């Protein structure tokens, strides 16, 4: 059935964290007559109530599975990965509809073993509740247990974003792994750099112009070509000086040496 036909399909959002918050905002902002967010669940209900109040009238908030709407058309699991399958198993046999998870690292098969039809709607973005973003620019990656389920999820995705594509669970895992390297690890390294600066009386955000230029270059150059710095140049004198400076912090010294060696080896391979 097309999402554009008939009465609006009811959607229950399981979760009220960062991903669920932005997904809920996008669902409401789409103002679609095809699908309507009707209920939000979070354990205890506090986060669900806060999100439901933000999103407006007509959305109920519940804090226990006993209060859940059992006859909705959609159940979207926007919960931490380690909570996803345990929650699904609690709902097994109690609710029908199309079950969809938003995890990058969880296989579709894991959810499909609990319930069918099932699918995935994975938003490839970093989300924080307090930071607004344009969800229509967020790439969405879709998978379904069958062509009908996948088609419905694709159409839902197209209501929310301009960038929607099919992927397998294996491809999605690679995307998620790449995101951890590109986003999570790089953010951690920036946090390390900020702490280093503040400990030595320098402004925490002194590196922002450098970071902005680095990310801007990635829109036009492959990351390997955009690489700069002493390891890329083979500047052993500077590398040794930095390592001596970090001698009192062996973990940071090891991290610096490991990353420098990898940069140098990749540069030498061309």
Stretches found by the model and what they are:
Residues 21, 25-29, 53, 89, ...:
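Short, well-ordered alpha-helices that flank and scaffold nucleotide-derived cofactor binding pockets
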